[in-house]
Amino acid sequence: MAKIDLSKYGITGATEIVYNPSYELLFEEETKSTNEGYEVGKESELGAVDVMTGIYTGRSPKDKYIVVDENSKDTVWWTSDEYKNDNHPMSEDVWAKVKDIAKAELSNKKLFVVDAFCGANKDTRMAVRFIVEVAWQAHFVTNMFIKPTAEELENFEPDFVVYNASKAKVENYAELGLNSETCVAFNITSHEQVIINTWYGGEMKKGMFSMMNYYLPLKGIASMHCSANTDKNGENTAIFFGLSGTGKTTLSTDPKRLLIGDDEHGWDDNGVFNFEGGCYAKVINLDKDSEPDIYNAIKRNALLENVTLDENGKIDFADKSVTENTRVSYPINHIENIVRPISSAPAAKNVIFLSADAFGVLPPVSILTPEQTQYYFLSGFTAKLAGTERGITEPTPTFSACFGQAFLELHPTKYAAELVKKMEKSGAKAYLVNTGWNGTGKRISIKDTRGIIDAILSGAINTAPTKKIPMFNFEVPTELPGVDPAILDPRDTYADASEWETKAKDLAARFNKNFVKYTGNEAGKALVAAGPQL
């Protein structure tokens, strides 16, 4: 192992450097009685350690910055008054000051340094060095990223360095023109990330995802916020795009298939590959019987976040008093059915967009044309039901470009173009699957959704009789094995079909209004015809 010298990063006086600690050592460090505040880890009844992340129980998008310089100024998709996103500009001068705060915080301390890879493909992976002062943060990245072999560690040269100074604050933030004492900043030229005043583990995970989303498409590789799996022969690859709560993790974790990964993937000339070495699953209301794979992954070496334990370490998965965003990170080998030894598979044959439509308009499955594929990918639609106390309240739509707008560093059309190129080359087909509601006022059953996914993956959908749905011009099957035929045309689920039409007009208008932002260039204008026609 190379001797770790942190002085080249401006971090001096380290009292001890714990390098790539083992799980045994991490457990010992996390559960030490001398730990204070959010350093404290508690052992749960299942063997996994539970930690709290303080006021930040999710990412802090208003505090995300990218340094504006020669390399980034014309490539990054910057936020603007007209179209807001999370890529806020930061000057090189402010970056230097923020980095100084992190360096000062990390100097003269006991530190943990974890070297790991982001990306299962050796040609394009990013070697990342994480410098942290909290044991469980080292545990988190050990779970979530890909472990180098002993040989790879011998000559490990980081492509990217992450400084996690979660205990520090940007006290002079107003003077620096920042949003708050919290700062998550990226420098694309120096290949560095600085994290200040947030303990949320996901900032390190999604930070590196954002950087892969910057570098890979510029090399002609599709970078995707999706889950992916393949058949037992490792041949029939499928990818599942979808926003939080649409079923990405649940539907890709399938006992009949092998999981490639549950959240972040690339697609190059060799096929689809995972960026990660672990999974970061939501555990609110986790039920042992309906999600056994995730439940069984919660054991020693897994790390729970913001989950409530009693004094005996008993977990209450239903308790959302800290946050609804309770999570667990675990190494991917905690799931039995995974692609081994490398999380990759050939090019995808099927691309599935998951939308949970609370308006009750979209069919449970639509077969998309290439133009519709781009349109619905750029739209990135899902909808939640706000406050479903009694009866259905107002659905709130979310349009998140490429089903992952928060992590896009380039213009969304770049990601759409790369995806379409890869799909054309492999002959992949795309489907829009609604895991949300229909005219019955109930959510489409997971049994029917799984039947739909099975029909897509087996190819049965390609020989099914179809019809066209008006307004959206969707081609939908009229029968599929194992699926209730009465739900396939959403109009049939309403007592009065005109009610569907009223809701469909409303939703179609929302799609059209959202898509205006992509019509600034010819490629975007050409796709308008693939959207709903009123």
UniProtKB/Swiss-Prot annotation:
Annotated metabolic or biological route of this protein: Carbohydrate biosynthesis; gluconeogenesis
Compartment annotation: Cytoplasm
Keywords in alphabetical order: ATP-binding, Cytoplasm, Decarboxylase, Gluconeogenesis, Lyase, Manganese, Metal-binding, Nucleotide-binding
Cofactor note: Binds 1 Mn(2+) ion per subunit.
Cofactor: Mn(2+)
EC number(s) per entry: 4.1.1.49
Biological processes, Gene Ontology terms: gluconeogenesis
Keyword Manganese: yes
Binding sites annotated in the UniProt record for Mn(2+): K206, H225, D263
Major localisation: cytoplasm
Gene Ontology MF: a single term: metal ion binding
GO cellular component, one term: cytosol
Residues engaged in binding substrate: R59, Y200, K206, R327
Record's catalysed reaction(s): oxaloacetate + ATP = phosphoenolpyruvate + ADP + CO2
Residues engaged in binding ATP: 206, 225, 242-250, 291, 327, 443-444, 449
InterPro entries to which the protein is assigned, alphabetical: PEP_carboxykinase_ATP, PEP_carboxykinase_C, PEP_carboxykinase_N, PEPCK_ATP_CS
Function recorded in the entry: Involved in the gluconeogenesis. Catalyzes the conversion of oxaloacetate (OAA) to phosphoenolpyruvate (PEP) through direct phosphoryl transfer between the nucleoside triphosphate and OAA.
NCBIfam families reported for this sequence: pckA, PRK09344.1-1, PRK09344.1-2, PRK09344.1-3
Family: Belongs to the phosphoenolpyruvate carboxykinase (ATP) family.
Protein name: Phosphoenolpyruvate carboxykinase (ATP)
